[in-house]
């Protein structure tokens, strides 16, 4: 037996194991079948959680649950128990101290989702009558999403294809993680404070329930509900539903579908305009024909046909001119609108912007090259001046005038008394050096 290891009592050993289980392992989620469920008068619940090959004792204390919580749980039922491991010291049995129980298959997150969904639905946040109508032709569209994700690219490409003249404002936010809900709320508040957008898109790509959990935040749902600007959700894929989808004024299956929902199609607008012009022209023709019929009817009734015909023909000519003028003005007005749309579409052509940027870049390169040359010349001149100054004050320059430097053992001598007869000294000249022996010392 090793003398270096302490000898423990059973109580001490169990206490150490209990401390390790409680402090090192942390919260666990365990799925299994309830067995040996006991509900004593103390209000605590005790049961065994087992699978086909193993089991663990569980304790669900009164202060952790409501009195009616386990009424629907019985022996043989599959559950997921969440809690921390501990040790019952008296018998040396480790056990799970349960903090929460849900039915197996539902999952903790799904249960929270359903509870919040029921709560908000009971408050009327999902009611169709409180949802705002989307604008038919928005001038400015706000996008709340990650600026680096795939969703933003899908949205921007769809907007550029369907309605390129719309202005777009991006309100960046994280869409996953602990800080994402608050950032999404802040972006919604900022967009409402700006009052520049007619509609907002709240979007992110697909993912698991954990990835999309930021959009199941209660505070975010309430912020969507009180938004003065209509909110369109485009979260995940077609089968994904979040609390934000239920509260939003319109739920789109994907970010691309959200961009489609908030924009008209330019081609459809032109078709509508063409149809309106055709209908107006048809109405004018019908009106003229109707007036002609009335005129013919009156001609048959009047006693003086020529005078009556002349009067009504003048009236008919006047009305015809007025109708043709009104039709022409309407057509010209819509042609101007089409020209404006065409000009705006041409201005948004990226090729023109790229050429402008190229010219600006070339000018900047030429300017930078000139400035670098000037700076290098200045540094060269300064270096030459410094070298001249250093040479003037250098001890080696003094040697050029016939002076010498005397040293012994690599130490410079300043007085004759620093050397003794027989010493070997070194004399440094402007060119070369001399090794000399001291034969005489004079003051």
UniProtKB/Swiss-Prot annotation:
Gene expressing this chain: xseA
A GO cellular-component term linked to this record: cytoplasm
Recorded catalytic activity of this chain's protein: Exonucleolytic cleavage in either 5'- to 3'- or 3'- to 5'-direction to yield nucleoside 5'-phosphates
Keyword presence, Cytoplasm: yes
Main location: cytoplasm
Family indicated by similarity: Belongs to the XseA family.
HAMAP family per record: Exonuc_7_L (MF_00378)
Taxonomy of the source species: Bacteria, Pseudomonadati, Pseudomonadota, Gammaproteobacteria, Legionellales
Localization, UniProt: Cytoplasm
GO biological process assignments: DNA catabolic process
GO MF term list: exodeoxyribonuclease VII activity; nucleic acid binding
Name of the protein this chain belongs to: Exodeoxyribonuclease 7 large subunit
EC number: 3.1.11.6
PANTHER family: EXODEOXYRIBONUCLEASE 7 LARGE SUBUNIT
Keyword annotations: Cytoplasm, Exonuclease, Hydrolase, Nuclease
